[in-house]
C-alpha cells in the first residue's frame, strides 16, 4: 500500500496513518496531517486509524476510516454503522457517559469562545432516563429501491436512501407502524415519489406516538389528494392492527423543494389530533404542531425552567414562542397570569384549546411576533415578572431582546436547542442589562450531537 508523504499536496484517495485528536460538535473525528485538518466519520479521540482521503479543500478535508490500528475504550463496537452513515445516531459509537461529558464541554467551550468568559456556571448535564427508543415522533422518507417501495433514512448530506428497519432512537411501535405500512404498500404496488422524474405518490411517513397515553397519529405525505387504488384498504388494515391509532391524515406536498410538509391536511380516519400529558396537564397535538420529541426529558427541562424562574403565586409571566402552550399551561397553576404569543395562528388556536381543556382561566394567547406584541402589552400596562423564551435553532432576533428588556422583568428564562446561537444571545442580553446567572444542559437527544439547555438571566 502506497502512502503519499508530500504533506503539502493532499489528493483524493491518499492514505495516511494518524491519531484522532478531537471530536467536532457534529461528532466527526479530527485528524491533522502536518497541521492540516481532516474530518472523519466513525473516529474517536485517541484512536489510531488508516485514513482514506475523500475530499480536500483549501482549509480542511474529509476522510474515512479504512482500518483501526487501535480503538478507544469508549467505543460502542456493536452499533449498526448505518446509524452513523445516516446521522440517525451520529454519537452512537461513543459510550453514553462520554457523550454526556462531550456535550457539557461543548456548551462550556461555545460560551467561552462566543461570549468571551470562562466562568459561566454550566451545571452538570441532566442525563436521559432512556438512551434509546425515546423519540415520540419520526419523519421517514420513502423511495423506490430496486423496484420496491422502501423506508429508511438518507445518507448524510444526500438524498440517497439507506434502508432501515430498526431506527434505534425512536419508540419501537413507531418502527412497527412504518414497516407495516411499507409491507402493505408493497402488496398493492404503490409507487413512492421520485425526485428526478417527479412521479409517484408517497413521499414520507410521519408517525407520532404520545408518551403517556400511547395514542398514535399517522400522516402520509403525498403528492396528490387523490387516493391510489386500495390505499383505503391499507388504512383499514392499519387501524385494525394498531388499535391505539387515533388519527390518519394526508399531507399534500406537490412541491419540488426539500421541505417535508405541505400546508394542506386531509383527515382520513379518526380525529385531527392526539392527546398526551405533560407535567399532569393535557394537550391536544395536531399534525403540524411542535411538541418535544422526548417527553420525560422535556418534563425535566420545563421543571428546571420553572425552578430557575423562581416563580411566585402573584407572578405575571410571558411565554414567548408559545407554540401549543406547553410551557405556559404547565406552570399556569403556579402563577397569577400567563401571556403567550406565537406567529402561527393554528398554534395559537391549539394553545387556547389546550388552556380550556385544562380548565384554566388565567391564560391569554395572541398571534404575532414578540417584537410587536410585547410593546403593545407594555402600553396596556402589562408588566411581566418573568419572560420565558424557547426559540428555534436560529435563536433570537435582536429586536426580541430589546423588546424583552423594555418589559423590565426581574428574570428571563431561555430554553435553547442550539448552544451557538444561545451564546451569541448571551452577549446581546448582557448589553441590554441582563446577566447570565446559570446554565443547565439537559440531554433530550441521546446518541446524537444535539443538546438542549435552560438558562436564567437576572436584571443588573
Swiss-Prot record:
Signal peptide: none annotated. It comes from Lactococcus lactis subsp. lactis (strain IL1403) (Streptococcus lactis). Belongs to the class I-like SAM-binding methyltransferase superfamily. RNA M5U methyltransferase family. S-adenosyl-L-methionine binds at residues 292, 321, 342, 390. It is an enzyme of class 2 (transferase). InterPro entries: MeTrfase_TrmA_AS, MeTrfase_TrmA_CS, NA-bd_OB-fold, SAM-dependent_MTases_sf, TRAM_dom, U5_MeTrfase_fam. It holds the Pfam family tRNA_U5-meth_tr. The active site is at residue 417. GO terms for molecular function: rRNA (uridine-C5-)-methyltransferase activity. Keywords: Methyltransferase, S-adenosyl-L-methionine, Transferase. This is Uncharacterized RNA methyltransferase YljE. PANTHER family: RNA M5U METHYLTRANSFERASE (PTHR11061), TRNA (URACIL(54)-C(5))-METHYLTRANSFERASE (PTHR11061:SF30). Its EC number is 2.1.1.-. GO terms for biological process: rRNA base methylation. Residues 9-67 form the TRAM domain. The keyword Cell cycle does not apply.
Amino acid at each position: 500500500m502506497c502512502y503519499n508523504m508530500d504533506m503539502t499536496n493532499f489528493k483524493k484517495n491518499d492514505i495516511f496513518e494518524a491519531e484522532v485528536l478531537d471530536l467536532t460538535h457534529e461528532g466527526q473525528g479530527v485528524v491533522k496531517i502536518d497541521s492540516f485538518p481532516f474530518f472523519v466519520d466513525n473516529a474517536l479521540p485517541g484512536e489510531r486509524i488508516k485514513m482514506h482521503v475523500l475530499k480536500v479543500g483549501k482549509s480542511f478535508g474529509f476522510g474515512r476510516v479504512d482500518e483501526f490500528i487501535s480503538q478507544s475504550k469508549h467505543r460502542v463496537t456493536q452499533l449498526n454503522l448505518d446509524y452513523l452513515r445516516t446521522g440517525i445516531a451520529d454519537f452512537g459509537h461513543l459510550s453514553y457517559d462520554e457523550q454526556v461529558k462531550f456535550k457539557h464541554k461543548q456548551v462550556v467551550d461555545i460560551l467561552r469562545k462566543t461570549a468571551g468568559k470562562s466562568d459561566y456556571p454550566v451545571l452538570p448535564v441532566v442525563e436521559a432516563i432512556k438512551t434509546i427508543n425515546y423519540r415520540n415522533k419520526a419523519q421517514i422518507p420513502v423511495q423506490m429501491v430496486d423496484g420496491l417501495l422502501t423506508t429508511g433514512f438518507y445518507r448524510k448530506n444526500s438524498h440517497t436512501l439507506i434502508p432501515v428497519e430498526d431506527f434505534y432512537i425512536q419508540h419501537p411501535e413507531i418502527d412497527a407502524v412504518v414497516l407495516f405500512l411499507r409491507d402493505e404498500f408493497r402488496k398493492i404496488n404503490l409507487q413512492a415519489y421520485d425526485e428526478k422524474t417527479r412521479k409517484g405518490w408517497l413521499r414520507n411517513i410521519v408517525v407520532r406516538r404520545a408518551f403517556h397515553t400511547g395514542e398514535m397519529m399517522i400522516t402520509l405525505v403525498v403528492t396528490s389528494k387523490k387516493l391510489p387504488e386500495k390505499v383505503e384498504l391499507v388504512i383499514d388494515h392499519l387501524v385494525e392492527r394498531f388499535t391505539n391509532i387515533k388519527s390518519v391524515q394526508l399531507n399534500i406536498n406537490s412541491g419540488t423543494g426539500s421541505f417535508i410538509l405541505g400546508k394542506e391536511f386531509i383527515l382520513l380516519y379518526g380525529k385531527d389530533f392526539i392527546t398526551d400529558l405533560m407535567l399532569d396537564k393535557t394537550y391536544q397535538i395536531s399534525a403540524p404542531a411542535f411538541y418535544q420529541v422526548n417527553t420525560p426529558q422535556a418534563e425535566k427541562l420545563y421543571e428546571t425552567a420553572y425552578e430557575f424562574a423562581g416563580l411566585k403565586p402573584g407572578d405575571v409571566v410571558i411565554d414567548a414562542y408559545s407554540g401549543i402552550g406547553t410551557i405556559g399551561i404547565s406552570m399556569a397553576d403556579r402563577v397569577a397570569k400567563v401571556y403567550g404569543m406565537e406567529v402561527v395562528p393554528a398554534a395559537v388556536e391549539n394553545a387556547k384549546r389546550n388552556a380550556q381543556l385544562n380548565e384554566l382561566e388565567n391564560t391569554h394567547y395572541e398571534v404575532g411576533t414578540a417584537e410587536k406584541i410585547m410593546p403593545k402589552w407594555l402600553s396596556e400596562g402589562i408588566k411581566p415578572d418573568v419572560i420565558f423564551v424557547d426559540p428555534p435553532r436560529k435563536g433570537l432576533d435582536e429586536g426580541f431582546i430589546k423588546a424583552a428588556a423594555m418589559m423590565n422583568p426581574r428574570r428571563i428564562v431561555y430554553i435553547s436547542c442550539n448552544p451557538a446561537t444561545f451564546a451569541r444571545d448571551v452577549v446581546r442580553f448582557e448589553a441590554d442589562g441582563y446577566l447570565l446567572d446559570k446554565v443547565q444542559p439537559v440531554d433530550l437527544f441521546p446518541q446524537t450531537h444535539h443538546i438542549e439547555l435552560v438558562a436564567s438571566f437576572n436584571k443588573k
